[in-house]
């Protein structure tokens, strides 16, 4: 049986990390695509040597020719300008929108049956534009953001509670930005609701509030520490988990930026919600019940995403 083909559109730090993880997880052959052929070729060559150490027979190649993505089973899009200190996701929109047009058009032309995962920021607007440019159905284009934000929330909660992160279940919904909605009320630790742990004295409400705020600014915290780049290990791990669920028909549930058509009262936008990913792509969108405060926060987050989408339409008439 032939191996699957994984295309990584963007061969920067996230792209290189994705390629390494895809090789280690034996997901299939890997093609790194970038505007200049040498960096992806260099990383592919280096990773081929690493594959020999790992005993992996995957074929890793680098290219600048978009035609080389033909027949891809999965495309993970990281291309574009990453965040820098003092530059928020919104400021990246005008720069990265043309990149989404180029890659989206290539996906629609060369691999229209692929499952596409977008990492490029501002994520919810970029995945919306990518789907429009590609012409792919909504179930086959998804944004990674909520998986990463939820992982940060789970990590911070596990650290504060002194428990294994595997015991913490928590989701962050809404847009992948400062208005995201960490659902701490619905979080559990070993099956015990987080509010119950507050009553038991395991953690204070103030500590939870601080964790919520740190989750919202987690990306900026990494950017400010790295200075010359944004996060790349965690985003790559998140995207690989999504790709693995698709390729293996695992039907895992993730908080991810999906195209909504009436769910949560939202239509025509990509917003972070719980989705089940299997061989059919996004196979289910799970609608949770919010309390009044959660609904208020979610509505505000959706409004922020909608504003970015309107900016996309203003910048590119073809999206209007």
Curated annotation (Swiss-Prot):
GO terms for molecular function: L-lactate dehydrogenase activity; L-malate dehydrogenase (NAD+) activity. Pfam families: Ldh_1_C, Ldh_1_N. Keywords: NAD, Oxidoreductase, Tricarboxylic acid cycle. NAD(+) binds at residues 10-15, 34, 96, 119-121. The gene is mdh2. InterPro entries: L-lactate/malate_DH, Lactate/malate_DH_C, Lactate/malate_DH_N, Lactate_DH/Glyco_Ohase_4_C, Malate_DH_type3, NAD(P)-bd_dom_sf. Catalyzes the reversible oxidation of malate to oxaloacetate. Belongs to the LDH/MDH superfamily. MDH type 3 family. It catalyses: (S)-malate + NAD(+) = oxaloacetate + NADH + H(+). The keyword Oxidoreductase applies. Substrate binds at residues 83, 89, 121, 152. GO terms for biological process: lactate metabolic process; tricarboxylic acid cycle. It comes from the Bacteria. The keyword Transmembrane does not apply. It comes from Rhodopseudomonas palustris (strain BisB18). This is Malate dehydrogenase 2. The active site is at residue 176. Its EC number is 1.1.1.37.
